[in-house]
Curated annotation (Swiss-Prot):
The lineage of its organism: Eukaryota, Metazoa, Cnidaria, Anthozoa, Hexacorallia. It is found in: Secreted; Nematocyst. The keyword Disulfide bond applies. This is U-stichotoxin-Hau1a. The modification Hydroxyproline is found at residue 36. It comes from the Eukaryota. It comes from Heteractis aurora (Banded sea anemone). Belongs to the Hau1a/HC18/HC19 family. Residues 1-21 form the signal peptide.
Length: 62
């Protein structure tokens, strides 16, 4: 029964990534979520829980 749970979890993660506008050319950036090497985001961007860089509306200038 446990393998079925992992399979369902994998399918759910895949569907979530599809809903986020996943494209094959985005694969290296998507894969960086699970790798120890994390690329830095541009200025005024922050990394969300999907690992993508999101632009901040009120840009906090450092």
């Amino acid at each position: 029964m446990k393998p079925a749970i992992f399979l369902m979890l994998f399918v759910a993660m895949f569907l979530i990534s599809e809903g986020e506008g996943f494209k094959p050319k985005d694969a290296p950036q998507e894969r960086s979520v699970f790798s120890p090497v994390v690329q830095s985001c541009p200025r005024c961007h922050r990394r969300d829980h999907f690992g993508k860089c999101r632009k901040l509306d009120p840009c906090p200038d450092k």
